Amino acid sequence: MTHNFAENYDIIVVGAGHAGVEASLAASRMGCKTLLATINLEMLAFMPCNPSIGGSAKGIVVREIDALGGEMGKNIDKTYIQMKMLNTGKGPAVRALRAQADKALYAQTMKQTVEKQENLTLRQAMIDEILVEDGKVVGVRTATNQKFSAKSVVITTGTALRGEIILGELKYSSGPNNSLASVTLADNLRDLGLEIGRFKTGTPPRVKASSINYEKTEIQPGDEQPNHFSFMSRDEDYITDQVPCWLTYTNTLSHDIINQNLHRAPMFSGIVKGVGPRYCPSIEDKIVRFADKERHQLFLEPEGRHTEEVYVQGLSTSLPEDVQVDLLRSIKGLENAEMMRTGYAIEYDIVLPHQLRATLETKVIAGLFTAGQTNGTSGYEEAAGQGLVAGINAALKVQGKPELILKRSDAYIGVMIDDLVTKGTLEPYRLLTSRAEYRLILRHDNADMRLTEIGYEIGLVDEERYAIFKKRQMQFENELERLDSIKLKPVSETNKRIQELGFKPLTDALTAKEFMRRPQITYAVATDFVGCADEPLDSKVIELLETEIKYEGYIKKALDQVAKMKRMEEKRIPPHIDWDDIDSIATEARQKFKKINPETLGQASRISGVNPADISILMVYLEGRQKGRKNIN
């Protein structure tokens, strides 16, 4: 078919949420002529739900995005109203940063970045059709019948894909925050042969700040100690004039109001059909599932410095409006609350992610990539991480360069993508630290050490940033070597000073590095005895040193496991293998292999329902094929 294209691009990104922004910025920064098309320009990088970035596991993802050359970390560092390190009382593997965002400023600042980006065109347009010829993407068609050509297309439509808002007895076509839904494109994706699922998510009501009695709530301040998402942000730029959040709780009256109105709750009346998020349930779902609980936490989170809107975290609901008002006013501190926006649920179509490769390219259509909530995930950070990987791989494909696949041992982003393409998901997928088997080496403090080199090689990390990274890397390696070479001896003067600090005296000589392995010995304490490095160390280098030294044994064990798994990850499975040709594998394994078409032996081993015996048989089969080829040659 001949198309009359209005404009020609290398890459077109459909949707400008958190996934679409990262995808389009990555592609354009890698030199590809890119179009970012979105239904509404005012909603670029908009936060339709929580006004925050980061949190458990998610905060580590933001640092990974930053280390690879993405934008989310830089943007939130410019626009936060509160910053807090979570899980400080736990081990380093689960610590993560979380920021309250100035919601409007975050979107506005990101829009300015996109508008100024070279090679990137921003267009308000509804995309109705992905144009495909001979199994390959060739472009898109808009609702106004404009056609644009592209060598790759990235779909990042979020919850707009056949979106429907549900509120009490009401159900109507809509994207998030009452934006337009994308219905024709949803039909088009199904027609192209993609399997489509249906998920649901929700958001809580917003209340007016001046109507809250804060004296009845508990203040939740940010951290005084500087922390940042971007490794390029400076401690001296840390915002100290932070805005607090506030803690309150539901109570028995709140629960009674919900229980008395369950017949009007879409979750229980049958109106909601989509599968909701396990780790972010609605308040009505929590009351029913955890009936023994007398109260549930609610955090009152300001949506910015220049707005009265306050997000009631923990009160996601699709109950009718009148019930929401009664529910709010049953809560301590909210007795006179004015509801500015109602909570609601939203159902939307997703592309079932087992149809994707680890590059996030679809297996059905060459050059078509999907990312974000379109793939069945929840959360801005998960979306941004996928968008970055999809944008990078779309650009690499256009340029004819090797693809980027992040392994489970490389990044939480790699864990997430592997989970999606290998196991699929039956509910909105959320990243958790428990999903990562190598979480001690996937920490927030070493994201730059893990990924900056990759970002530099693909062209997203510039020379200035790379030079700063190399300097930090050298500082870390030199200081580690120095600490391992200096001895502390159990002489009386040294032990006296150690005891004065409240620590146990030395019984044997040991290196400064060994001394730092003691739980209570920080880098600052150690350098009191052995002196400082020749030049002052970056605070991020000191944090990295302390973690790497104290957990050295555990980290080494994790790296040994990675090395063993690497052999399986490097064993490729031919793309057009005939699974019926392999004798003796279990029926369930054969069915799963046919459905997912794993690309490596390692991926095959992680498919649910596949046992070690199946993998052994597959390994023997692959080795036999390889020997057969050698004999033919």
From Swiss-Prot:
It comes from the Bacteria. GO terms for cellular component: cytosol. InterPro entries: FAD/NAD-bd_sf, GIDA_C_N, MnmG, MnmG-rel, MnmG-rel_CS, MnmG_C, MnmG_C_subdom, MnmG_C_subdom_sf. GO terms for biological process: tRNA methylation; tRNA wobble uridine modification. FAD binds at residues 15-20, 127, 182, 373. It is found in: Cytoplasm. One of its GO terms (molecular function) is flavin adenine dinucleotide binding. NAD(+) binds at residues 276-290. The keyword tRNA processing applies. Its main location: cytoplasm. PANTHER family: GLUCOSE INHIBITED DIVISION PROTEIN A, PROTEIN MTO1 HOMOLOG, MITOCHONDRIAL. Homodimer. Heterotetramer of two MnmE and two MnmG subunits. NAD-binding protein involved in the addition of a carboxymethylaminomethyl (cmnm) group at the wobble position (U34) of certain tRNAs, forming tRNA-cmnm(5)s(2)U34. This is tRNA uridine 5-carboxymethylaminomethyl modification enzyme MnmG. The gene is mnmG.
